[in-house]
Amino acid sequence: YGPAGTGKSSLAKAIAQQFGLPLNHFYLSTMDDDDFKRAWENSVTNSPCIILLEDFDNVFNKRTPVNKEQNLNFVTLLNTISGVQDSSGVLLIITTNHIENIDDAIGVYTDKNTSSRPGRIDRIVYLGEMDEMPRKKLINKILKDWPELADDAINETKNFTAAQVQEYCIQKALIKLQEKI
């Protein structure tokens, strides 16, 4: 969990890539109960895999659907992910910008980065603004052709998310490219 642009979805993709697992991205806002159950069963049947439920707080605020036209019921989702069907081989990743909007039945943060509901959500990880070293690496990678911009970028992007750092560097690089034209 964490602010937008911190790399939550990118982390899920990187985990899938690192372990050579398919990433099954469930678009909850477009699913009804049957769609969700069918997609879950298909993923379990074809496991090992990763299921990504992205921006969960955009679909449910606690147990209440955010969109009145939504056809996926929270209880169906809950029963499916913790149901009687063996889900071994499935890594479930849920991302959210607002962990306070996640219902306790899914699992809430404890002081040890674990969940109050192991078996549904086992670990809770916060992704925030970038620390200096990874920020430097990202900046140097994006601005490799303009090292003179890197020092300023490092100083000017404190407390930025990864997406904000990337956008900042791209804008600086575009200015340099336009100067050449």
Residue ranges and their predicted role:
Residues 30-32, 56-59, 97-102, 129-135:
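Conserved nucleotide-binding/hydrolysis micro-motifs of P-loop NTPases
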Residues 57-123:
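Conserved catalytic/switch belt of AAA+ P-loop NTPases
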Residues 22-27, 126:
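Conserved RecA-like helicase motor-core motifs
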Residues 109-181:
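C-terminal alpha-helical "lid" subdomain
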Residues 10, 34, 38, 69-72, ...:
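Charged, alpha-helix-enriched surfaces in structured cytosolic catalytic cores
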Residues 31-59, 72-84:
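Conserved alpha-helical scaffold flanking the Walker A/P-loop in AAA+ ATPase domains
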Residues 1-24, 38-45:
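Walker A/P-loop
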